[in-house]
Amino acid sequence: MDFYYLPLSAPCRSVIMTAKALGIELNKKLLNLFEGEHLKPEFLKINPQHTIPTLVDNGFAMWESRAIMVYLVEKYGKQNDPLYPSCPKKRALINQRLYFDMGTLWKSYADYTYPQFRENKPADPELFKKFESALEFLNIFLSQSKYAAGETMTLADLAILASVSTFDVVQMDLSKYEHILRWYNMLKDTAPGAAENWAGCLEMKKYFKK
């Protein structure tokens, strides 16, 4: 199972943690976006959208991290796997959190920070307010349950952990979010693949400081 990735990418790290939780060995293929390796013809044949992470499982190629995470559990997980249980209501809640991470939490972080370290633009206070709003939503979610989508660890936790650990390593102030901190301190060192996730965060920090 070939896995095209960059360690500093939070979406890539969420897939790595999912694979670790399932006991799946990934054949990791480093793809250096900064050198344009994702635009080479051989990779475009695999993924015409030229994004990472990309997974190739016995000739079947797919991308988008959260879709990959769900695929891995559905194909290789246990029946009614706690990471993504078969109950429609439980799955719906996990899906909501996954889409929240993609479309609100991570997006607001990227919208705020990427112009600063990619284009050397000043911080935009309005974009920071949107990021804070996303953190407040997450804090509310985590005030209602032990984990991101209920009382057991699910794919939602692994996706959001990849995001929040990135916020941590670039020194975003999370101190006023009591429930995020409780959850993060519980998982940051104990989640499957936590060490590799943090190593990728440290790579991200180097890039952020450039």
Swiss-Prot record:
Record has Cytoplasm as a keyword: no
SUPFAM superfamilies (UniProt xref): GST C-terminal domain-like (SSF47616), Thioredoxin-like (SSF52833)
Protein name, per record: Glutathione S-transferase 2
Binding site for glutathione: S9, H50, T51, I52, E64, S65, R66
Gene: Gst2
Gene3D superfamilies: 1.20.1050.10, Glutaredoxin
EC identifiers of the protein: 2.5.1.18
Superkingdom of origin: Eukaryota
